[in-house]
Amino acid sequence: MTKIYIDGDACPVKDEVFKVAGRYGLAVTVVGNAWLRLPQDPMITMIVVPEGPDAADDRIAELIEPGDICITNDIPLGSRCLIKRALVLRPNGKPMTENSIGDALATRDLMNTLREIGTMTGGPPPFAKADRSRFLSALDTMVHQAKRVVP
């Protein structure tokens, strides 16, 4: 059965995930390096990992299986999940796919380089109400896709 994993430390759509998962009876695991207040629901669990770079990502990549869904903005984690035949959705509602992940990794590396040399100093645009709406719709669609991967 499909499970949803949330890269939880800075995820702005946890409540939306809980809502959609509840509608479909899906288990949700939030992974982060600090305890978060979560709804009291037997289908929602929290895994706290030690602090450190990529500790949460490593745990999600270890647990995720084909047909599961990962909610993350982390492109390398998204790539690792796609390799395991999981589905990946960004909090802004844009999916990461096998077709888009290569470009996303290259763009990420380019942006890191530009920031390092001081050419670019900004980050991503702020999270907007339209992103939340797009996310809800995309997650609903992705749940149906996941059911086709793992009946």
From Swiss-Prot:
NCBIfam families named in the record: PRK00124.1 (NF001095)
Domain of life: Bacteria
UniProt cross-references to Pfam families, sorted A to Z: DUF188 (PF02639)
Cysteine pairings via disulfide bonds: none
UniProt family annotation: Belongs to the UPF0178 family.
InterPro entries assigned to the protein according to its UniProt record, in alphabetical order: UPF0178
Name of the protein in its database record: UPF0178 protein amb2838
Organism: Paramagnetospirillum magneticum (strain ATCC 700264 / AMB-1) (Magnetospirillum magneticum)
Annotated HAMAP family: UPF0178
